[in-house]
Design a protein with these regions (language model features):
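Serine-esterase "nucleophile elbow" of acetyl-processing enzymes
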Residues: 1-75, 79-89
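Alpha-helical cap/lid subdomain in secreted, periplasmic
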Residues: 56-62, 76-221
Length: 221
């Protein structure tokens, strides 16, 4: 098994791990090879919306998701991601990292994100990769930090000509009391909105016959 992730690890990171770190990984319809497979990568927000995306992609694509508390600067992040990339054939990756990185050194996070994209594209040549912005929070100061990371993420994604799913803009106009259940997380109604927005972002890159549409991906539409 190739250990490509070692080539892309940062030589140093100043970020310390959180008191509790966690990782959740599910592959649905694992034995089915008749439909393309979408990998959703994110954190607890991804853990919240994956079921809504999976429901909407029924009959179009199978879904794997990996939700983790780790920042892309964590030495083990790429190791875990590489294992998931190897597990099943993938057609499209919807990628987010950010809410557990709000206080991470910006230069380190940018370098690690860039290396993460490089590793994915090196590991899976021709894979369709989409950047997803982090969602806003109820705390304005934390939201401002998310905006900073989203701007960096969008710039790095543009370097690779990756399409972007601006989930931040979908959620930011909404009422914090109605659609948030705590500082970070969302109500069932908000998860439905996220699931619909993500599905609409993914669908142009998947056709209804179960084959990814490379021309749509190239256009970024």
């Amino acid at each position: 098994m190739d250990q490509i992730h070692r080539k892309y690890e940062l030589p140093h990171t100043s970020r310390r791990r959180e008191e509790f770190e966690w990782s959740i990984h599910y592959a649905f319809n694992a034995g089915d090879r008749t439909l393309p497979r979408v990998l959703l990568v994110g954190d607890s927000i991804c853990n919240g919306y994956h079921a809504q995306v999976r429901e909407r992609l029924l009959g179009i694509a199978n879904v794997t998701f990996w939700a983790s508390s780790k920042c892309v600067t964590d030495p083990d992040y790429l190791r875990e991601l590489e294992f998931i990339l190897e597990e099943y054939p993938l057609d499209l990756i919807h990628f987010n990292n950010g809410l557990h990185s709000l206080t991470t050194d910006r230069a380190e996070w940018e370098a690690a994100l860039r290396n993460t994209f490089r590793m994915i594209l090196d590991k899976l040549p021709g894979i369709r990769l989409m950047w997803c912005a982090s969602t806003p929070l109820t705390d304005p100061e934390l939201t401002a930090q998310a905006v900073e990371l989203n701007a960096i993420g969008a710039r790095v994604a543009a370097e690779f000509n990756l399409p972007a799913d601006d989930l931040f803009s979908v959620m930011n106009p909404l009422d914090r009391k109605e659609f948030w259940c705590d500082k970070y997380h969302f109500t069932p109604a908000a998860k439905e909105l996220q699931g619909e927005a993500i599905t609409q972002a993914l669908k142009p890159f998947l056709n209804t016959t179960g084959n990814a549409d490379p021309e749509a991906f190239r256009r970024g539409t």
